[in-house]
Design a protein with these regions (language model features):
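Cytochrome P450
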Residues: 1-413
Length: 413
């Protein structure tokens, strides 16, 4: 298993590189490693890693091609699911079923129900609520003193939105990010799996209680009730229900939260881009897409080959893990010129892969985009200047691009 220092990508033979080595995702060295792989070995085989052997797919074109063939490259939980990191499991250690970890045709029926909560009309209905809450949050922040943007802005805004989506008890909403962090925590997976399981069981018990309550009540427009009263999802067993709730909590929490946090990092690295946004508010929707591209809140998605297949001259065997590195495809020089830079008005920012591609494209993409757009818009309307007051701390996580802390000070607006 690789234990090389973070700068090893500069000297190691290409065959010895392990793109999943967790510290790279905390110190940023994952980006030059991926640049090297795109140039020298865009389809790369890692024989020895913490997560076993796997293939890496690193270019935008190759990722979309793999994504477009879901019956050859499977997402099924029974085959390993969508990540090389340990997935959520039940008490027997079996991976929890969730619709993201299903293949067609089963996947489409399950996804269709959840998608009802994210139609354009539903997003429009939520829009004013998002704007009011975002404005209030920004106006409540301390001025000229250091605070953690992740804690006071990113986490609070995404937690409130999740609670509204689920109609989760408002006075308990603080539990949602705690459960999300437990599901994804590399530290708990590696060092305290029982604590992780305990927290997941707590989540399961609370959502099962809500499931029982709403099963016996009239349907309401929240996502939880929609799932329970739908023909496609209403007959699912308890484990699948909890698996889907885990998916929606992590998806709704981590993608948006980490993009909101990463935006502050980006505009401090390139302050001219923030001034460009303030001067040209019409580019804000594009700037939100560029944020999602540059941050890459989901670093990879994993598939499993269902048959022997040749790809770009390489032979994949049935059962091989195939890892699509979104964090690499989002900076592919063939698609995104100067892709390591945040460029607020980048013309093709929406071609990012952070929401996936094909049948598994993120069902909540519109809502995530809206939340980020509103945050940028409300900051720009206040001519707000948010300056870093310390290092941005990232988690050593090869699946979710978790930003743990962004110490800042508001010096204007």
């Amino acid at each position: 298993m690789a234990t090389a220092p973070a700068e090893a990508h500069l000297v190691e033979p290409i065959d010895a590189l392990d793109p999943s080595f967790p510290p790279r995702f905390a110190d940023g060295s994952i980006h030059p490693l991926m640049t090297r792989l795109r140039a020298e070995a865009p389809v790369h085989y890692c024989r020895d890693s913490k997560y076993g052997p796997f293939w890496s797919i690193t270019t935008h074109k190759d990722i979309t091609e793999i994504e477009a063939l879901p019956l050859i490259y499977s997402s099924e939980a029974s085959r390993g699911g969508v990540s090389i990191v340990e997935p959520p499991a039940d008490r027997q250690g079996q991976a929890m079923e969730m619709f993201i970890a299903m293949d067609p045709p089963r996947h489409a029926d399950k996804r269709r129900v959840v998608a009802l909560a994210f139609t354009p009309s539903e997003i429009a209905r939520l829009g004013e609520n998002i704007r009011v809450r975002t404005a209030a949050r920004l106006d409540s922040l301390p001025r000229d003193e250091v605070f953690d943007w992740v804690k006071l802005v990113s986490t609070d805004l995404t937690t409130d939105m999740l609670a509204i989506l689920f109609d989760f008890p408002w006075d308990e909403r603080h539990k949602l990010p705690v459960w999300s962090d437990a599901i994804t925590s590399i530290n708990l997976i590696d060092n305290n799996p029982q604590e992780r399981l305990n927290m997941m069981f707590e989540m399961a018990a609370r959502f099962y209680q809500l499931w029982q309550e709403r099963s016996n009540a009239e349907p309401t427009p929240d996502l939880l009730s929609m799932m329970i009263h739908s023909s496609a999802l209403g007959q699912m067993d308890q484990i699948e229900f909890i698996g889907n709730m885990a998916l929606l909590i992590v998806g709704g929490n981590d993608t948006t939260r980490n993009s909101m946090s990463g935006f502050i990092d980006a505009i401090n690295r390139w302050p001219d881009q923030w001034e460009k946004i303030i001067a040209n508010p019409e580019i804000i929707p594009n700037a939100a897409s560029e944020t999602i591209r540059w941050v890459s809140p989901v670093s990879h998605m994993r598939r499993t080959a269902t048959q022997d297949v040749e790809f770009r001259g390489h032979q994949f065997r049935e059962g091989d893990k195939v890892v699509m590195w979104y964090i690499s495809g989002n900076r592919d020089e063939r698609i995104f010129e100067d892709g390591a830079r945040f460029i607020a008005d980048r013309e093709n920012a929406r071609r990012h892969l952070s929401f996936g591609y094909g049948v598994h494209r993120c069902v909540g993409a519109r809502l995530a985009e809206l939340q980020i757009q509103v945050l940028i818009s409300e900051m720009a309307a206040r001519n707000m200047k948010v300056e870093l007051a310390g290092d941005v701390i990232r988690d050593p996580h090869p699946f979710v691009g978790i930003i743990k802390s962004v110490p800042v000070k508001i010096t204007r607006g």
